[in-house]
């Protein structure tokens, strides 16, 4: 069934810009304040007040545009988007329509492998349509008011950058990969804190399906306010199934706005989807056109950090990482800095090993305890010493994991923690040939059946003998030497 249909996805992402004050007023943007304590006369739309543009919001938009190789409009216009909602006091939202500040651009994503579907990891470039500045609306509160709705206008006027893609994603996996790449970029640039639980980064997914080979797009449904990557994936997967089943049963997909219910793992209809003309956009007469001269753009460009895409390419070229691995270790600025600090200690020859540890043991522990890399109990220098001891043959990879966990659990602060633990627990790898030969002779004598099976051509028996040798040394034998000595003795 699925092979008859092509999925078409476009994302609209609202990134809350990290300014101290709102986009058109001096009110604070701090999250979690008591309701309506951060709403000034401009936010409340009181008579006689006028909006004043926040320069910091514009600079953050320029940063983003430069980072995605977009065109920064030298002149852009703010428009009024007219609609009624209780948490929109003015009766319109100040946004950009015909001439946005950021035009075009692209983001390259790394889509992970899907073993169940038999798909390998691949790279894809997603083109962006635009990114425009706008103000956020307030918030409706339903829980604390029996039979009524409360309105909190603290969020009204908070600066947003709405980032719109072309409809070029063809699966939920691609949409999630794009959302993660975008999230990583805005956090990397420092223009958004990326806190999805607080609503700083939220996605609307436009989803449609069409028969394979058809050029015309199908009717789309927009799924609003998805504030986690898991919800984004689940919502798209459900919506794709819903639309395909509806069409195959003889029904018609309706253009509408839908909400995702994470408890039921399904989307439900919210309202009919509006078109642009329904909002009666027109230029805001209270705001002059936004003029950005070339010198301003050049100054911002000179202040940009090394971007994730450039760093990924450097890691591939300099350290021999795969594009996917380079993408993982540059998922955040702190992660990339940690990785480079490890490599600086162990040397470029161990760069791939360092990446594997960062994506494996380190990430596993961080995820298990809900920590960011910046809060890792094991420092880059401590991990580097663990990797050095593997490289110089002092410990095996298995023992290294034990030492890593010991450093993690005791929250050791000494850089030489690995050496201290190796010495205290007697974990040095046995590499003495004479000692290993004696152990292997004992293993062979005690496991004659496995010896006979190996000589009869059963390779699994050889692995069993290696396992017995490692068991006899409590995992401290040098695995490579054990392998070589066993082969020698078995002829």
Curated annotation (Swiss-Prot):
<dbReference type="Pfam" id="PF02637">
    <property type="entry name" value="GatB_Yqey"/>
</dbReference>
<keyword id="KW-0067">ATP-binding</keyword>
<comment type="subunit">
    <text>Heterotrimer of A, B and C subunits.</text>
</comment>
<dbReference type="InterPro" id="IPR017959">
    <property type="entry name" value="Asn/Gln-tRNA_amidoTrfase_suB/E"/>
</dbReference>
<dbReference type="InterPro" id="IPR042114">
    <property type="entry name" value="GatB_C_1"/>
</dbReference>
<dbReference type="InterPro" id="IPR004413">
    <property type="entry name" value="GatB"/>
</dbReference>
<dbReference type="GO" id="GO:0050567">
    <property type="term" value="F:glutaminyl-tRNA synthase (glutamine-hydrolyzing) activity"/>
</dbReference>
<keyword id="KW-0547">Nucleotide-binding</keyword>
<keyword id="KW-0436">Ligase</keyword>
<protein>
    <recommendedName>
        <fullName>Aspartyl/glutamyl-tRNA(Asn/Gln) amidotransferase subunit B</fullName>
        <ecNumber>6.3.5.-</ecNumber>
    </recommendedName>
</protein>
<dbReference type="Pfam" id="PF02934">
    <property type="entry name" value="GatB_N"/>
</dbReference>
<dbReference type="InterPro" id="IPR006075">
    <property type="entry name" value="Asn/Gln-tRNA_Trfase_suB/E_cat"/>
</dbReference>
<dbReference type="InterPro" id="IPR014746">
    <property type="entry name" value="Gln_synth/guanido_kin_cat_dom"/>
</dbReference>
<dbReference type="InterPro" id="IPR023168">
    <property type="entry name" value="GatB_Yqey_C_2"/>
</dbReference>
<comment type="similarity">
    <text>Belongs to the GatB/GatE family. GatB subfamily.</text>
</comment>
<dbReference type="GO" id="GO:0050566">
    <property type="term" value="F:asparaginyl-tRNA synthase (glutamine-hydrolyzing) activity"/>
</dbReference>
<dbReference type="GO" id="GO:0006412">
    <property type="term" value="P:translation"/>
</dbReference>
<dbReference type="InterPro" id="IPR017958">
    <property type="entry name" value="Gln-tRNA_amidoTrfase_suB_CS"/>
</dbReference>
<keyword id="KW-0648">Protein biosynthesis</keyword>
<dbReference type="GO" id="GO:0070681">
    <property type="term" value="P:glutaminyl-tRNAGln biosynthesis via transamidation"/>
</dbReference>
<comment type="function">
    <text>Allows the formation of correctly charged Asn-tRNA(Asn) or Gln-tRNA(Gln) through the transamidation of misacylated Asp-tRNA(Asn) or Glu-tRNA(Gln) in organisms which lack either or both of asparaginyl-tRNA or glutaminyl-tRNA synthetases. The reaction takes place in the presence of glutamine and ATP through an activated phospho-Asp-tRNA(Asn) or phospho-Glu-tRNA(Gln).</text>
</comment>
<dbReference type="InterPro" id="IPR003789">
    <property type="entry name" value="Asn/Gln_tRNA_amidoTrase-B-like"/>
</dbReference>
<dbReference type="GO" id="GO:0005524">
    <property type="term" value="F:ATP binding"/>
</dbReference>
<dbReference type="InterPro" id="IPR018027">
    <property type="entry name" value="Asn/Gln_amidotransferase"/>
</dbReference>
């Amino acid at each position: 069934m699925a092979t008859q249909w092509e999925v078409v996805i476009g994302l609209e992402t609202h990134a809350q810009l990290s300014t101290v004050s709102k986009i058109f007023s001096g009110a604070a943007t701090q999250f979690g304040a008591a309701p309506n304590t951060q709403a000034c006369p401009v936010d409340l739309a009181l008579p006689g007040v006028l909006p004043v543009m926040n320069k910091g919001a514009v600079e953050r938009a320029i940063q983003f545009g430069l980072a995605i190789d977009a065109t920064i409009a030298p002149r852009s216009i703010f428009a009024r988007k007219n609609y009624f909602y209780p948490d929109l006091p003015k009766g319109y939202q100040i946004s950009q329509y015909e001439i946005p500040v950021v035009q075009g651009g692209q983001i390259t994503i790394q889509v992970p492998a899907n073993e169940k579907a038999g798909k390998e990891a691949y790279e894809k470039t997603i083109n962006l349509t635009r990114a425009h500045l706008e103000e956020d609306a307030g918030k409706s509160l339903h829980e604390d008011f029996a039979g009524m709705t409360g309105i909190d206008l603290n969020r009204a006027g908070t600066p947003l950058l709405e980032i719109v893609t072309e409809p070029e994603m063809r699966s939920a996996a691609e949409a999630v990969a794009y959302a993660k790449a975008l999230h990583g970029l805005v956090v990397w640039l420092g223009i958004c804190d990326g806190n999805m639980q607080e609503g700083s980064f939220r996605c609307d997914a436009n989803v449609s399906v069409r028969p394979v080979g058809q050029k015309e797009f199908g009717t789309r449904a927009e799924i609003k306010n998805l504030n986690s990557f898991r919800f984004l994936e689940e919502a798209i997967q459900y919506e794709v199934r819903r639309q395909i089943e509806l069409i195959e049963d003889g029904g018609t997909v309706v253009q509408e706005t839908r909400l995702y219910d994470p408890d039921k793992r399904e989307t439900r209809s919210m309202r009919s989807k509006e078109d642009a003309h329904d909002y009666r956009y027109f230029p805001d007469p209270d705001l002059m056109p936004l003029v950005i001269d070339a010198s301003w753009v050049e100054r911002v460009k000179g202040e940009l950090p090394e971007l994730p895409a450039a760093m990924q390419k450097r890691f591939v070229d300099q350290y021999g990482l795969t594009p996917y691995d380079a993408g993982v270790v540059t998922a955040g600025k702190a992660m990339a800095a940690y990785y480079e600090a490890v490599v600086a200690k162990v040397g470029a020859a161990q760069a791939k090993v360092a990446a594997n540890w960062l994506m494996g043991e380190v990430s596993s522990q961080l995820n298990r305890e809900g920590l960011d890399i910046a809060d890792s109990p094991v420092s880059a220098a401590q991990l580097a010493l663990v990797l050095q001891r593997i490289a110089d043959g002092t410990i095996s990879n298995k023992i290294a994991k034990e030492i890593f966990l010991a450093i993690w659990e005791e929250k050791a602060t000494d850089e030489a923690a690995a050496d201290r633990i190796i010495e205290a627990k007697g974990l040095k790898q046995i590499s003495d040939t004479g000692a290993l030969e004696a152990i292997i002779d004992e293993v062979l004598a005690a496991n004659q059946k496995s010896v006979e099976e190996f000589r009869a051509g059963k390779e699994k028996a050889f692995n069993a003998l290696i396992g017995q040798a490692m068991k006899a040394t409590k995992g401290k034998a040098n695995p490579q030497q054990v392998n070589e000595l066993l082969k020698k003795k078995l002829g």
